[in-house]
C-alpha cells in the first residue's frame, strides 16, 4: 500500500488530536505497574486447577478487550512445582473450540506432553499427573493445538512454569516471587485504536506486531529494592526475536537458560531471546538509579503514522521494563555467586548423526507434519548429534529432551548459550548434542518443530519416538 500525501495530511491531523483518543502510537509514553501473575503452587498432593476461558484485559488505559486466558485472566498464573513432586493438573476447557496444552521444557514421558492425542473438546477436562524429576528451571505452558497454536497463544493461552529444587532454594540469589524475583513474559501484538488485539495470519513466515507487551502491559515499571533483582525472561511471541540490553549500558548477569542454571553467571551487554526461549538474569540495583531494559530502536514518527494505514512490524516502543529502586533494604545482599552448578561432563558418545532442514516453506526435511508418521526413532538414555539448518532464521524446539549447543555456524556458542537447552535460534546452521532422557510412544510422540508458531501450524513439525530403556 503506498503512503500518499493525502494520507500524510490525514495522519498529521490525527496526530494533532492524539491526546483525545486512545491510539496505539500514543501508548509508548504511558507507563503502568507491571502486572505480576498470581502464583499457583503444588502443595500436599492437592491438584492444580487450570480453566481455559474467555476473559477481559486492559492493554491500554481506560479500555478492556476480550481475550482468552487461564483462571479468568489474560495469560495464566505462574505455576511453581518442586523436584520430586507428582503434580496433578486439571485442565478444563471452557472455550468454544478444541484445545490441547503442553508444558514446554518439561521432561516427562510422551503421554503427559499433550498434543493431538490429548485434545480437549469444549467443556472437556484433562487431568495428567506429572512426575517432576528435573532440575530447577523456568519453563512455560501454552496451547499446542494442531493448526491453531499461533492464534490460541496469541489470544492468551500461555503462562510461566517454575521448577525448584534444593539447589535453587539454597543459592544466594533472589527467590521471593513478586518481590525480588519477577516473571517477564514478552510478546508483540497489533492493537486497534480501542486497545483490542488484532490477529491475521501472514501469507508467509510468522506474525509480527507493532506493540510490545510484558505480562500484558505496555511500557511497564516495577518498584524493587536496592540490591539484586532476578528477572525470569520468556519470549512468548509468535515469531519475533529480541535483543535485550540495559538503557544505561550496565551488565545483564545471565544465570540460567531453558533447562536450568549455567555453571557460573555470565555477564553480557546484550542478550538474545528467541521465541519460546527462557533465560534468567540478575540486575544489580545497588546504586539506586532507575534503569530500563530495552530491545532496539523504536519506530520513528513517520513509521507510527504509516501504521495507521497499513500493518507495521516496527515496534512503536522498545521499552521492555523499567526498574525503579525504592528505599527498601534488599532481601539478598550477597555478592554474585562465582559458581551455580558443578560442571557436568557428558558421559557416552553420540550414537548417530541427523540432519534437520527448515526451509522458507512449511515442513521439516521437505515433509509436512503427518500425525500418522514417525519421523525419528531413538533410544532413551542415548545421545545424538543433530545438525539443524534454516533458510529463513527461526527458533527451533525439541520436546522431551535436553541438548547442548556444540557450534553455531562453525563457531563456539556464546557463553550464555552453553547450558542445557530445549530451544535454539537457527540462522544458518547449529550443531546440537541431544540427550534422550524420556520415553515416548507411537500414539504419544514428542514433537520437534519450528517455534515460529505459524510455520508450525502450517506443517513445520516432526514426530519422534523414543524407545524406553530396557
Curated annotation (Swiss-Prot):
Keywords, ordered alphabetically: Cell cycle, Cell division, Periplasm, Signal
Residue ranges of every copy of the Plastocyanin-like domain listed in the record: 222-287
Pfam family, one: Cu-oxidase_3
UniProt entry tagged with the keyword Cell division: yes
PTM notes: Predicted to be exported by the Tat system. The position of the signal peptide cleavage has not been experimentally proven.
Any one cellular-component term (Gene Ontology): outer membrane-bounded periplasmic space
SUPFAM superfamilies: Cupredoxins
GO molecular function: copper ion binding; oxidoreductase activity
Stored InterPro entries: Cu-oxidase-like_N (IPR011707), Cu-oxidase_C (IPR011706), Cu-oxidase_fam (IPR045087), Cupredoxin (IPR008972), FtsP (IPR026589), TAT_signal (IPR006311), TAT_signal_bac_arc (IPR019546)
Metal-binding keyword on record: no
Annotated localization: Periplasm
CDD domains in UniProt: CuRO_1_CueO_FtsP, CuRO_2_CueO_FtsP, CuRO_3_CueO_FtsP
Functional description taken from the UniProt entry: Cell division protein that is required for growth during stress conditions. May be involved in protecting or stabilizing the divisomal assembly under conditions of stress.
PANTHER family assigned to the protein according to its UniProt record, in alphabetical order: BILIRUBIN OXIDASE, CUPREDOXIN SUPERFAMILY PROTEIN
NCBIfam families (UniProt xref): PRK10883.1, TAT_signal_seq
Family stated for the protein in its record: Belongs to the FtsP family.
Name by which UniProt lists this protein: Cell division protein FtsP
Organism: Salmonella typhimurium (strain LT2 / SGSC1412 / ATCC 700720)
Gene: ftsP
Amino acid at each position: 500500500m503506498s503512503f500518499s500525501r493525502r494520507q500524510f495530511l490525514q495522519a498529521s491531523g490525527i496526530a494533532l488530536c492524539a491526546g483525545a483518543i486512545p491510539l496505539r502510537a500514543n501508548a509508548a509514553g504511558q507507563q503502568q505497574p507491571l502486572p505480576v501473575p498470581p502464583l499457583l503452587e503444588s502443595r500436599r498432593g492437592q491438584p492444580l486447577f487450570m480453566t481455559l476461558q474467555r476473559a477481559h484485559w486492559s492493554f491500554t488505559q481506560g479500555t478492556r478487550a476480550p481475550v482468552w486466558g487461564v483462571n479468568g485472566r489474560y495469560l495464566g498464573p505462574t505455576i511453581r512445582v518442586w523436584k520430586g513432586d507428582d503434580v496433578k493438573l486439571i485442565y478444563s476447557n471452557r472455550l468454544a473450540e478444541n484445545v490441547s496444552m503442553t508444558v514446554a521444557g518439561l521432561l516427562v514421558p510422551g503421554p503427559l506432553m499433550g498434543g493431538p492425542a490429548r485434545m480437549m473438546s469444549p467443556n472437556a477436562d484433562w487431568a495428567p499427573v506429572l512426575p517432576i524429576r528435573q532440575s530447577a528451571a523456568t519453563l512455560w505452558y501454552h496451547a499446542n493445538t494442531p493448526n491453531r497454536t499461533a492464534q490460541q497463544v496469541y489470544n492468551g493461552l500461555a503462562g510461566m512454569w517454575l521448577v525448584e529444587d534444593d539447589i535453587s532454594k539454597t543459592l544466594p540469589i533472589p527467590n521471593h516471587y513478586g518481590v525480588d524475583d519477577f516473571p517477564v513474559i514478552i510478546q508483540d501484538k497489533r492493537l486497534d485504536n480501542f486497545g483490542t488485539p488484532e490477529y491475521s495470519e501472514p501469507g508467509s513466515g510468522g506474525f509480527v506486531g507493532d506493540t510490545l507487551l510484558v505480562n500484558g502491559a505496555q511500557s511497564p515499571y516495577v518498584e524493587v529494592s536496592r540490591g539484586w533483582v532476578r528477572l525470569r525472561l520468556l519470549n512468548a511471541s509468535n515469531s519475533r526475536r529480541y535483543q535485550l540490553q540495559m538503557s544505561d549500558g550496565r551488565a545483564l548477569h545471565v544465570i540460567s537458560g531453558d533447562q536450568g542454571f549455567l555453571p557460573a553467571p555470565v555477564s553480557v551487554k546484550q542478550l538474545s531471546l528467541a521465541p519460546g526461549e527462557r533465560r534468567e538474569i540478575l540486575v544489580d540495583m545497588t546504586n539506586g538509579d532507575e534503569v530500563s531494559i530495552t530491545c532496539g530502536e523504536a519506530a520513528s514518527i513517520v513509521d507510527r503514522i504509516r501504521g495507521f494505514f497499513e500493518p507495521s512490524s516496527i515496534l512503536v516502543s522498545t521499552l521492555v521494563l523499567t526498574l525503579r529502586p525504592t528505599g527498601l533494604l534488599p532481601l539478598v545482599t550477597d555478592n554474585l555467586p562465582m559458581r551455580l552448578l558443578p560442571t557436568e561432563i557428558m558421559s557416552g558418545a553420540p550414537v548417530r548423526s541427523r540432519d534437520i532442514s527448515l526451509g522458507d516453506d512449511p515442513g521439516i526435511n521437505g515433509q509436512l507434519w503427518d500425525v500418522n508418521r514417525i519421523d525419528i526413532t531413538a533410544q532413551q538414555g542415548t545421545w545424538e548429534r543433530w545438525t539443524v539448518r534454516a533458510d529463513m532464521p527461526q527458533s527451533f524446539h525439541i520436546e522431551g529432551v535436553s541438548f547442548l549447543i556444540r557450534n553455531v555456524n562453525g563457531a563456539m556458542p556464546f557463553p550464555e548459550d552453553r547450558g542445557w537447552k530445549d530451544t535454539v535460534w537457527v540462522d544458518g546452521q547449529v550443531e546440537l548434542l541431544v540427550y534422550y532422557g524420556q520415553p515416548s510412544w507411537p500414539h504419544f510422540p514428542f514433537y520437534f518443530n519450528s517455534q515460529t508458531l505459524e510455520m508450525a501450524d502450517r506443517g513445520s513439525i516432526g514426530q519422534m519416538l523414543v524407545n524406553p530403556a530396557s
